């Protein structure tokens, strides 16, 4: 046998004796970025890193420190990027993605949504809308959202579970952390819905009991699916006693329905939410419906009285503020007073119709401008508080403070990367101000939910984007055709050359 040369033998012995890598193995290491943790100390780490194993964060710290502790199956170079918790949207509407701008400069928006959601939509409509708005959220770094299964004046598509099933199946594939709010629509009952089979329409009269039963079916099928990533919430229409006074049997019936819906939320341990609160409706919800509490989220809640702010604070009820919504223009949202009373307030988009977006950076900026203008004071709503309202405060409002909202060991790996080297984001110092004042959703490069990459380097990973937009266009066209709303696609009189619409 041929002898091994001494030099080669020495190399082989050296390699063979090398100590094994003692570093812990993780699935993903994001390193080299500016890490905005939103933890209790609100740490910002220059050249920071986040280590992920499975669905959870295992460590956050300086890149050099985590490099020494962990070896990763996959590493993301976050140089010249901001690494932060995924954004959270507390109020939206399923369906709105396919009715954008429809009737917005007239009084036709609510009737149009009622017609389409109740009588012009199909399973394919709801599925296509979920894929479309799911893709939009992923692109904008919105990792957690709550949406009602319908909209307008509480037109809920809960006449049959198949619509909610289709919606949640799509969201399951997209990969978002998602809460679907279901429940009855506004009375009286029965309400007329239409089921479409091909080109054939079948009218269906739907009762309150039927809608509540469909809601419970969806809860049993979907709540806490995929390791808790998909959840259900219960919703009930907000009653405005000043606008629609009720007495006698009509009031008794409404109260019974509200309490039955609230009881279902408690039975299943669900968040309970209401849309469209304004002056006096919060007091009614507390004193007549008796439905408020720490697991309740009230949306809009504009024009609240001092007494109502005290009620919300006393009951521990949470509030979602939609600064870009039309409702916020009709009455002031009393954010400063609510925060000073100790109420948890988060931000919401109010969906994307008729004139909005799921870009939560846009709503952060809008919230600051809205309240500073209202108070004529540029010190109102500091940028840091606005960022908290789409991260840590938002997580608390949804009852998820132990799971999401900040980058900390043990929390779910809901993480986004924001390009900090684009012209409008430069110079790169003061990253917190860049996020609050200059960033927009299109600056997000990478979105991670539950430890899974949903978008990397601006490329969606879980859906075919071209197919998503093509399906959305087709279903929007079909819904408008079924309901005969083609005229609403035209530019209205008064669009050009006037100081206000007629």
Role assignments for model-derived ranges:
Residues 12-48, 52-63, 391-502:
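Active-site microenvironment of metallo-dependent hydrolases
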Residues 88-90, 145-147, 178-182, 230-236, ...:
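Hydrophobic faces of well-ordered beta-strands that scaffold small-molecule active sites
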Residues 21, 159-296, 307:
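Metal-coordinating catalytic core of metallo-dependent amide/deamination hydrolases
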Residues 98-128, 155, 159, 187-204, ...:
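Active-site gating loops and adjacent loop-to-helix segments of metal-dependent hydrolytic enzymes
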Residues 291, 336-425, 438-440:
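His/Asp/Glu-enriched, well-ordered alpha-helical/loop segment
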Residues 266-268, 290-296, 311-320, 340-345:
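Glycine-enriched alpha-helix->loop->beta-strand junction motifs that scaffold or abut catalytic
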Residues 101-177, 213-227, 473:
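Alpha-helical scaffold segments that flank or form the walls of functional sites
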């Amino acid at each position: 046998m041929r002898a091994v040369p001494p030099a080669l033998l020495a190399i082989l012995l050296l390699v063979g004796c090398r100590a094994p890598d003692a570093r812990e193995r993780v699935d993903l290491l994001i390193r080299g970025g500016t890490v905005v943790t939103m933890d209790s100390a609100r740490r910002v780490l220059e050249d920071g890193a986040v280590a992920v194993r499975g669905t959870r964060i295992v460590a956050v710290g300086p890149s050099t420190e985590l490099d020494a502790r962990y070896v990763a199956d996959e590493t993301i170079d976050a140089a010249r990027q901001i690494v932060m918790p995924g954004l959270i949207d507390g109020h939206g509407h399923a369906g709105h993605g396919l009715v954008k701008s429809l009737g917005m400069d007239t009084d036709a928006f609510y009737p149009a949504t009622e017609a389409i959601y109740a009588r012009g939509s199909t399973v394919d409509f709801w599925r296509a809308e979920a894929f479309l708005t799911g893709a939009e959220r992923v692109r904008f770094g919105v990792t957690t959202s709550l949406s009602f299964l319908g909209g307008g004046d509480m037109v809920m598509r809960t006449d049959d579970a198949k619509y909610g099933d289709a919606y949640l199946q799509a969201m399951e594939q997209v990969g978002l952390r998602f809460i679907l709010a279901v429940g009855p629509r506004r009375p009286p009952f029965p309400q007329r819905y239409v089921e479409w089979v091909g080109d054939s329409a079948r009218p269906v009269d739907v009762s309150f009991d039927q809608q509540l039963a469909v809601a419970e079916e969806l809860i049993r099928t979907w709540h806490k699916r995929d390791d808790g990533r998909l959840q259900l919430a219960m919703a009930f229409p907000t009653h405005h006693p000043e606008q629609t006074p009720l007495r006698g049997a009509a009031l008794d019936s409404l109260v019974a329905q509200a309490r039955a819906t609230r009881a279902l939320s408690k039975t299943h341990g669900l968040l309970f939410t209401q849309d469209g609160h304004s002056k006096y409706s919060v007091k009614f919800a507390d004193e007549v419906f008796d439905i408020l509490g720490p697991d309740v989220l009230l949306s809009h809640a504009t024009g609240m009285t001092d007494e109502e702010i005290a009620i919300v604070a006393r009951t521990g009820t949470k509030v979602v503020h939609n600064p870009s919504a039309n409702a916020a223009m009709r009455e002031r949202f009393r954010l400063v007073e609510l925060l000073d009373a100790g109420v948890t307030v988060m931000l919401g988009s109010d969906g994307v119709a008729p004139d909005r977006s799921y870009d939560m950076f846009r709503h952060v900026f809008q919230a600051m401008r809205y309240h500073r203008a209202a108070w004529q004071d540029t010190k109102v709503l500091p940028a840091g508080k606005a960022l908290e309202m789409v991260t840590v405060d938002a997580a608390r409002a949804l009852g998820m403070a132990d799971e999401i909202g900040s980058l900390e060991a043990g929390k779910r790996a809901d993480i986004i990367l924001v390009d900090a080297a684009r012209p409008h984001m430069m110079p790169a110092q003061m990253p917190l101000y860049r996020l609050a004042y200059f960033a927009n959703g299109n600056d997000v490069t990478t979105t991670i939910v539950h430890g899974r990459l949903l978008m990397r380097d601006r490329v969606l990973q879980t859906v075919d984007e071209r197919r998503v937009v093509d399906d959305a266009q087709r279903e929007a066209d079909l819904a408008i055709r079924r309901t005969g709303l083609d005229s609403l696609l035209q530019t209205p009189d008064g669009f050009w050359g006037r100081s206000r619409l007629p």
